[in-house]
């Protein structure tokens, strides 16, 4: 991915922890109850609520990179019929809902929820520092600081996704060079896994990577001199102050959508796990200033897939199995 010329833009986001509420209306007819359609609609609504709780239904942009996830804290419900239709005039009055019974559990219990994503969790230990910069907004602050959310250093899903995407591309190229027959061209595999926009055609990413908080990290402020990337020499008068974090722990949480074709799901998970293994072993750096050792990690525990440990080798073997080696059959 490369930057577009003259395409810089600003955007406003809501930080984690913001709260709000929304209203939802379900309109049913008398015949819906007789035919069972009312019960079906309620169950579909319950599945939507469960999908939100599970993090599989998100809102807004950059949903596949950790944005737009929220939790339902409570659900209040009111029924309006021909006997009390006048009360509907106050349906959107917040005060009317303050003492309403919380029926969230009842709705979730009737959902019959079946997860539509495979969840992968990778515990990581930060080796040294990390540099995902935000620039100073006030006088007297360091020129560059590590990106934070409510004062907690974070690694955004976009940073992880960019590094992992590039590593998967390298892995696929190496597999092809060793004689493997890929299920599709490696560029098409990347597009399916990470999404694409091609004029009027587009596909959202099948891999979702959340923002990760770095816990128990030590804050470090240092003075540095800028270096010319063309000459590899010190720039004159380019002294700057930087605030970074070192030696913390974090958990990378990724999801892979379950599609109509199970084979696609298997090889997507397989090649993703190969890249995550490189991340755990310190072969893949994330963020900026990687040339001076920033953004490297080590394993802080086993990879968990849908809450179970020790499954990654099976998924990787399945991915390789779907690729035919020269002279090895299918």
Question: PLM features: residue spans?
Answer:
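Small/polar/charged residue-enriched interaction surfaces, especially the RNA/DNA-contacting tracks
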Residues: 1-330
